[in-house]
Structures are given as C-alpha cells and as structure tokens.
Amino acid sequence: MLDKIKALLQEVENMKAANAEELEALRIKYLSKKGEISALMNDFRNVAADQKREVGKYLNELKETTQSKINELKESFENVQTANDDIDLTRTAYPIELGTRHPLSLVKKEICDIFGRLGFSIAEGPEIEDDWHVFSSLNFAEDHPARDMQDTFFIQHNPDVLLRTHTSSVQTRVMEKQEPPIRIICPGRVYRNEAISYRAHCFFHQVEALYVDKNVSFADLKQALLFFAKEMFSPDTKIRLRPSYFPFTEPSAEMDISCNICGGKGCPFCKGTGWVEILGCGMVDPNVLENCGIDSKVYSGYALGMGIERITNLKYQVKDLRMFSENDVRFLRQFESAN
C-alpha cells in the first residue's frame, strides 16, 4: 500500500490540466467519495499496526498535496479568465498623465529669473548648519529668542548643529569664501519649530538676496525692490518701506506692496489697508561683513529675504499654506496652465 501511495503522490505532483473540465475530472478521480484517495482511506484499516504510523503520514501528505494542487490549478484558470474578461480591444487607451512644476517651484523660478536679470547668480548651501553660520556670524545675540528650542530644531546630542532657520547662512558662507563684488540669491528650504496651521508650517521655502560692493546704498536696494515688485506682480504695483529690526541689517525695513487683489483700495485680503507685507530687507550690518572677513570701511551691501509660500499665496490667492505639501492632485492641476 505504501508503494501505491508514493506512486500516486508522484502522479499528483506532476498533475496538469488544460482547462476547467479536465481539472474537475482530476478532482473527481482523486478527491471524490469514490476516488482513489477515499479508497486508500478505506483500506487503511487493514494495514498492519506497526506500519500504520508511516502509512498514515504518507496518506495525509497525499491528500493535502492533491487538494493544494487542485486549488493551485483552479486559481490559475480563474486568473486567466478574469484577465480575458477585462480586455476590451475597442476601449480608448488611458491618457498619459504628464507631470508639471509645483506652484512653489514655479514661483521660485520666476523670482530667480527676475533677480537674474539684475545680475544675481544662484548660491546654495546645506540645510543642516552650525550655530556660527545661522546665528553668530549674523549678529544674533546669545540670548536671542531664535536660539531657543521653542523656535529652532537642534540636532540631538549636538547643540551646535541645527536645521537652518533661514537661508542667510548661505550668504555668510559665500562672503567667507568670495571677495566682493558679491551678487547672489539663495533659494532653499528652511525649518522653524512651529505648529502646523493654515498660515504656518514647520518647514517652508525662502529666497534671500545679497549684494556687496563698494558704495552700495539704500537707494540701490529700493530700486531693486521696486523692479522686483513690478515684474513679479504687475507694472502698477507700488511699494512701501517701513522701519523694522533684524540683527543682520542696519537700517532694516519691511516692504509692503499695494494689494494685488483690490489694487490698493482696501479689501478683506489686505484687511482694508490696501497694503500687503511681502519681505524684509536692509543694509548689511558692518559687524556681519567683518565676521565674514570683509572690510566694512571699504564695502557695503544690502540683503533681502522673502518666503516663497508668501509670494505664491499673493500671486495665486492660496489661502491655506498646508496645500503646498499635501500633494493633492486636484490642487496641483490648477497650476498646469502656469507651466
């Protein structure tokens, strides 16, 4: 009996069926009540007691292998049938989905192009920075709030290393390595320890500009800002500079533009003022120049910085900052015409 079971086991392992009808015939042959395996089960009672353990082992293996083989062949037929049913040769092909630039990439490119026409080149730097390039070289006091863990992401076990909070660190690296004249813009991602909401995020994107040369004045800065505003928004755009404070510039200012929604007449977007803030700027503090090895008695310069998300919000009236990082195709497709 053991030889017969082993022979059947070999036969089952090599079992094949061309279609569902042949498979059903094989199932009846082996697994039906009158099938060969059932017959062996009935004969098992006549096996000698000292052989039952070994014979029973092979008999169970035969039954399990047969059932598994039948199921495997059945599944293969079902998959083929499903695939054949799904094929419709008359159906129009799916359109190829073409990717487009992200709205932030569109605006960043536009900003870089505008300053490129003013002679600025692009400079980039690391997102993981040290305290010197992010804070100390830029005239931040030791007790400045920006150095707190509540505002900045520090690297664990190394308090001197952090995720940059602005791209000004790129400016200091360039000033350390390059002699004036320097005319650069620094686009990139920055990080702040802030709660995520419709108006704030733990990471966002900035573009900062730096111009250092002999006899650079605030008038040069103002003219560059006016050119940028008119090119970025519209030729009718007006600018307004308000005194402000930044550790790395003196004097410092914040720039507003006439609201591009209402044309400066006043609306809910500009809170009825007719003006919208877009960036900070100022003349580079002499201490910053000296920290980077540039003689502040010979050279002067201006710097400015803006959030790309902020400019994109103004240009396309996007009200929720989180939309830029959620990868919602319905939102992104609205910018296809701008590519």
UniProtKB/Swiss-Prot annotation:
Keyword check for Aminoacyl-tRNA synthetase: yes
Matches recorded under InterPro entries: aa-tRNA-synth_II, aa-tRNA-synth_II/BPL/LPL, Phe-tRNA-synth_IIc_asu, Phe-tRNA_ligase_II_N, Phe_tRNA_ligase_alpha1_bac, Phenylalanyl-tRNA_Synthase, tRNA-bd_arm
GO molecular function per UniProt: ATP binding; magnesium ion binding; phenylalanine-tRNA ligase activity; tRNA binding
Enzymatic reactions: tRNA(Phe) + L-phenylalanine + ATP = L-phenylalanyl-tRNA(Phe) + AMP + diphosphate + H(+)
Family: Belongs to the class-II aminoacyl-tRNA synthetase family. Phe-tRNA synthetase alpha subunit type 1 subfamily.
Native species: Parabacteroides distasonis (strain ATCC 8503 / DSM 20701 / CIP 104284 / JCM 5825 / NCTC 11152)
Cofactor, free-text remark: Binds 2 magnesium ions per tetramer.
Cofactor(s) it depends on: Mg(2+)
Assembly mode: Tetramer of two alpha and two beta subunits.
Keyword Magnesium (UniProt): yes
Signal sequence segment: none
EC annotation from Swiss-Prot or TrEMBL: 6.1.1.20
Positions annotated to bind Mg(2+): E250
Full protein name: Phenylalanine--tRNA ligase alpha subunit
Pfam families: Phe_tRNA-synt_N, tRNA-synt_2d
One GO term describing the cellular component: cytoplasm
Subcellular location: Cytoplasm
Gene Ontology biological-process entries: phenylalanyl-tRNA aminoacylation
This protein's UniProt keywords: Aminoacyl-tRNA synthetase, ATP-binding, Cytoplasm, Ligase, Magnesium, Metal-binding, Nucleotide-binding, Protein biosynthesis
